[in-house]
Design a protein with these regions (language model features):
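Short glycine-rich anion-binding loops that position phosphate/pyrophosphate groups of nucleotides
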Residues: 46-47, 86-89, 96, 166-167, ...
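Solvent-exposed alpha-helices and their adjacent loops that cap or buttress functional pockets
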Residues: 17-19, 58, 62, 72-76, ...
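A short, Lys/Arg-enriched amphipathic alpha-helix followed by its capping loop at the start of a domain
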Residues: 12-22
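Conserved small/polar residues in nucleotide/adenosyl-binding loops
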Residues: 1-5
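Phosphate/nucleotide-donor binding subsite
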Residues: 37-78
């Protein structure tokens, strides 16, 4: 557990431990962490800044909290890693210290995209690999299907390839080549189904469970959806504050809107998962609060219990 906003993160860690019985180890400077509520601490004297270069920071700051957390997983002193710090450095630490699962070409970030049905769409890659190869994206699909089943209970994950049209012949050369490879996979043996191309409008709909794309496109799509959601919520709040009548209407609608808000609230999902490394790694948003951190730790614990790493190893290597 890496420390950034120590108050929210420590509170979330303590809650995950106290309410769910999850053993948590904090990593950082003890004097800055504060009251841990009895949780153990792995001391780390350095902190990788949010704007630091990921690769060079991980290589040179060997006593940073991110590196120490990844080493704890590598050395079996922890089962998983959760961080709300520098995303690139988190990925680099997990990759360089714990290593890739045998047979996995590149790890990918799997991010839940909430939708109206209550079961999110898993989008990957959401930013780990700006440039991809078609065979990497086939592995993303395999890992995403395993994650969707383990995390959200999707019995037969429907895998879609994000493109500019549903027809098989549409898309960039990378998308077209990936489509051919995905169509050749025996998805039934993995308990999944390839449904072909999907479009951006399908990401929040009920038609697809796993949406596969390269990290550049996936990150742009994710940030676009986040921006749209933030602006829509802001516009609604502004509209409700217009008159006394709209304020009264808002109070009446609150019980119905609250469950909808929670369904689309990123904090309820805890964060994204880096799939493909030997140790489970949850990447939370830098602004994560107590709820998000507690949920992220719960997700990490669940992924360990369900042996998602082992399932991916079996799927990739047969």
């Amino acid at each position: 557990m890496c420390i950034r906003d120590r108050h929210a993160i420590v509170a979330g860690a303590r809650r995950a431990h106290e309410e769910n019985g999850i053993p948590v180890v904090l990593v950082g400077r003890p004097d800055e962490i504060g009251d841990t509520g009895g949780l153990p601490v792995i001391e780390a004297s350095e902190v990788i800044a949010m704007d630091a270069d990921p690769g060079s920071s991980v290589r040179t700051m060997k006593d940073s909290s991110l590196v120490r957390a990844a080493e704890a997983v590598r050395d079996a002193n922890a089962s998983a890693m959760v961080s709300a710090g520098n995303t690139g450095a988190t990925m680099a630490s997990a990759l360089l210290r714990t290593g890739r699962i045998k047979g996995v070409s590149r790890p990918a970030i799997a991010t839940p995209i909430p939708g109206p049905t209550g079961t999110p769409t898993v989008l990957l890659d959401a930013g780990a690999n700006a440039e991809c190869k078609s065979d990497w994206m086939v592995q993303f699909a395999q890992m995403g299907a395993i994650f969707a089943r383990a995390r959200f209970g999707v019995a037969t994950p429907r895998i879609g390839l994000l493109s500019i049209g549903e027809e098989a012949g549409k898309g960039s050369p990378l998308v077209k080549e990936t489509w051919k490879l995905l169509d050749e996979v025996d998805w039934a043996s993995l308990g999944a189904d390839f449904i072909g191309n999907v479009e951006g409008r399908d990401l929040m709909g009920p038609e697809v469970d796993v949406a596969v794309t390269d990290g550049f496109t996936g990150n742009v799509a994710l940030k676009t959806l986040e921006g749209c959601a933030r602006n829509i919520v802001g516009a609604l709040l502004e509209a409700f504050e217009t008159t006394e009548e709209t304020k009264a209407a808002a109070e009446q609608l609150y019980p119905a809107l609250l469950p909808l808000y929670k369904r689309f609230d990123a904090d309820s999902y805890g964060g994204a998962m880096l799939l493909g490394t030997k140790g489970p790694c949850i990447i939370s948003h830098g602004s994560s609060g107590e709820d998000a951190m507690a949920n992220a730790i719960s997700v990490a614990s669940e992924m360990v219990e369900l042996d998602v790493v082992g399932q991916i190893h079996t799927a990739i290597n047969g």
